[in-house]
Regions:
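Extended catalytic cores of very large enzyme megasubunits
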Residues: 1-195
Length: 195
């Protein structure tokens, strides 16, 4: 059945794509994907949906860049009276998810990178959280030159970079829409985009 999906002579059936066509239960035919998490537990792009998305990608060997900047800061109360726990608390869930999937049964080589904009209210907590609390994810700070100029946390950020706990990434736009970095910080994609 999957062979019928790729009958065109110009479609290269090599590597991951060929392996996936032969065994759709195996690794995904993509290496990397991006998910921008909305500030809601529910919904197609909410926090719970991101857990399912990340779980699926990691299970099949893809890397996932999870962008958390839309999540309200720790302690913020919304119009329903619900108090946010902030992006760092959810980062711990992604870390545990990656550890469990990577170790559960067969080793998979998917990576998980968390992203947070430098101007997010919880950026200091994000930068200074010990590696022991987020051991199975990498952390990336997304910024513009103006954000760098304005931040009071240059020292903490540089210490995080020096220790290998923090990566930096430029914020980019395409056709007036923000695009988001993938795991290796080389390709920018829309949410749920793949490379």
């Amino acid at each position: 059945m999957l062979n019928d999906l790729f009958p065109h002579p110009l479609v290269a059936r090599t590597g991951r794509i060929d392996n996936w066509i032969k065994n759709p239960e195996g690794r995904l035919p993509v290496s990397c994907t991006v998910f921008v998490v909305e500030d809601s537990i529910e919904g197609d792009n909410g926090i719970e949906a991101s857990w399912r998305f990340v779980s699926h990608a990691l299970r099949y060997g893809a890397g996932v860049a999870v962008h958390l900047s839309k999540i309200r800061p720790n302690g913020h109360t919304n119009e329903k009276g619900l108090v946010a726990s902030g992006p760092v608390s959810f980062g711990k869930v992604y870390s545990a998810l990656n550890e469990t999937i990577r170790r559960g049964g067969v080793y998979k080589n998917g990576a998980c990178v968390l992203h947070l904009d430098l101007d997010h209210a919880d950026i200091l907590e994000y930068i200074t959280t010990p590696r022991s609390e987020l051991p199975w994810v990498k952390r990336c700070v997304d910024l513009t030159p103006q954000m760098w100029k304005d931040t009071p946390y240059k020292k903490e950020l540089l210490e995080g970079i020096k220790s290998g706990d923090i990566w930096l990434n430029k914020i980019k736009y395409q056709n007036d829409q923000r695009i988001y970095s993938n795991v290796c910080l080389e390709v920018y994609l829309p949410s749920r985009g793949t490379c």
